[in-house]
Amino acid sequence: MKLGAFLLLVSLITLSLEVQELQAAVRPLQLLGTCAELCRGDWDCGPEEQCVSIGCSHICTTN
């Protein structure tokens, strides 16, 4: 019985860690319903990128 309880505990901890990783990966997708101000001008973007307006959002994209 103790071995079964131990295996259950390890399984739950592993599942919890995997769920936390998935939540962290999904967070950027939450910007889809809101305005994302990721840049204010081309100077906020990388060397081969430019700041563009998409709806109410501003994001960096490659040329």
Curated annotation (Swiss-Prot):
Keywords: Disulfide bond, Secreted, Signal. Residues 25-63 form the WAP domain. Disulfide bonds join C35-C56, C39-C51, C45-C60. The keyword Secreted applies. Predominantly expressed in white adipose tissue and liver. May promote activation of the metalloproteinase MMP2. It is found in: Secreted. Induction: Up-regulated by TNF-alpha and lipopolysaccharide (LPS) in vitro. Residues 1-24 form the signal peptide. This is Protein Wfdc21. The lineage of its organism: Eukaryota, Metazoa, Chordata, Craniata, Vertebrata. GO terms for cellular component: extracellular space. One of its GO terms (molecular function) is peptidase inhibitor activity.
